[in-house]
Amino acid sequence: MTRIQDDLFATVNAEWLENAEIPADKPRISAFDELVLKNEKNLAKDLADLSQNLPTDNPELLEAIKFYNKAGDWQAREKADFSAVKNELAKVETLNTFEDFKNNLTQLVFHSQAPLPFSFSVEPDMKDAIHYSLGFSGPGLILPDTTYYNDEHPRKKELLDFWAKNTSEILKTFDVENAEEIAKSALKFDALLVPSANTSEEWAKYAELYHPISTDSFVSKVKNLDLKSLIKDLVKTEPDKVIVYEDRFYESFDSLINEENWSLIKAWMLTKIARGATSFFNEDLRILGGAYGRFLSNVQEARSQEKHQLDLTESYFSQVIGLFYGKKYFGEAGKADVKRMVTAMIKVYQARLSKNEWLSQETAEKAIEKLDAITPFIGFPDKLPEIYSRLKTTSGSLYEDALKFDEILTARTFEKFSEDVDKTSWHMPAHMVNAYYSPDSNTIVFPAAILQAPFYSLEQSSSQNYGGIGTVIAHEISHAFDNNGAQFDKEGNLNKWWLDEDYEAFEEKQKEMIALFDGVETEAGPANGKLIVSENIADQGGITAALTAAKDEKDVDLKAFFSQWAKIWRMKASKEFQQMLLSMDFHAPAKLRANIPPTNLEEFYDTFDVKETDKMYRAPENRLKIW
């Protein structure tokens, strides 16, 4: 029998950990996943009902339902031939030479399913957040991240072997000749990319990935392709700069993307087209297409046809479904109460910043200014992005609709470049069980789906709600002041607003946070403190501020507060999935999230009478306080 004083996570969640079962089609179960399962069930019923009673007064939802019905028409899917896929494959197969590839870059971006072996993106400019910038990065890797390619990684060989076999089977389904050779060649190109790819640790420090280069310099360094013409075709103008997010890839560009490697690049593109098409046809192909992902995370079985139908519809109509969900399931009373909690949390933060002992008054005042400028969005957005009015289902096949949608979405990506950034837009649908802070707009967003038990309920006590959604709200506020967010000002621009000595003190705090988690063992391996530092700063800030707010309520119950905190992090997962998270997830493993932050809070020791001999004890001089 565990005790809270030795293991908060295991004690509070003992019954759940014993009884909870990981669904056969998922790699884990958690408080978040339980809500996802509930939402899936509700939405599947809702969309089935709407299929019988079409929402003709809501054109975007109507198109979503038409697509949903097409995704669920298994008779048509079983009969559908592969001519459209073969047509996509032919767009690459007919590129006989590297010269052919060079001459068709624009066509490939806008009118094919073939990904280029490099990527341009349109994102808010980190130093001018009201305008968009053109970003440049590599094409990504086949395995989850760079660490999987180390020869000592226990799963490297089996994953690459499985991917090759699975991919060649998919290629053969589409009558591609030399399928095994193509899969092997794709892996050879993938292996060439590894040294130049960003590590997960590098991606985690996103504020440090902003490397602007004048467009003239950017294009002149690349000799093998005419990127100047491509950029003009993409954004219909010549930007003054390109933001390079993967430096090593840019430096290695000509040694990777060249005539000598063309056969490997071509094979890589063919595998991407083939794998991407598997979701749109018969059941056997759908199962085959998901096999590698299931093997990677040790998932026992494929998603059911009904869940797949919903997944596919969400992949194109996420905000449409989210807005429907938010309006149906999220009430005004809940919205008002959560808004009250957000306001309370911001006030707590203001008070804590004004009393902060390690910041100068000047930096603390600027931090409070940034805090005051944070805009919260709760529940669901007021309107849909305009792009959804362009997605129209046709009389063609499911795959043909997807091709058309992809073309429209790609065109929209680059069309945005000449517009101002809409800082009120949501980057997460309302039915997603999550929340986020956006540094470029200085906004915090709480979708309707997370605003339910165990995170939040009007039936829960104030302490339970502060231990649940309160810590999530304060966590997102804390991201404005984590190692990345702290580098952005109140307008959302990457801008040094700290005094040097204050930022140096903050960097020391970051090092302490890294040390607090680094190497801590879990059942799947040790935690990487550098990878998870930003989320750990947010977790610590979140629980600290929410605790302060909970204590201001008349019905305060700190046992309930800490217990609820432990409940929201409950999780069980396959070992393979946990190992993948350890290598690439910016969040700490669930048990560490539940157990480590409370040990930095005096109230935890007082509430549960934690002694020096207890496993949860941390000496006062080692208790870390940041915000």
Curated annotation (Swiss-Prot):
Q: Which residues form the Peptidase M13 domain?
A: 1-627
> How is activity influenced by pH?
Optimum pH is 6.0-6.5.
Under which EC number(s) is this enzyme classified? 3.4.24.-
- Binding-site list for Zn(2+): 475, 479, 535
GO BP, sorted A to Z: protein processing
Gene coding for it: pepO
User: Which Gene3D superfamilies does the protein's record reference?
Assistant: Collagenase (Catalytic Domain), Neutral endopeptidase , domain2
Q: What is this protein called?
A: Neutral endopeptidase
Does this UniProt record's set of keywords contain Cytoplasm? yes
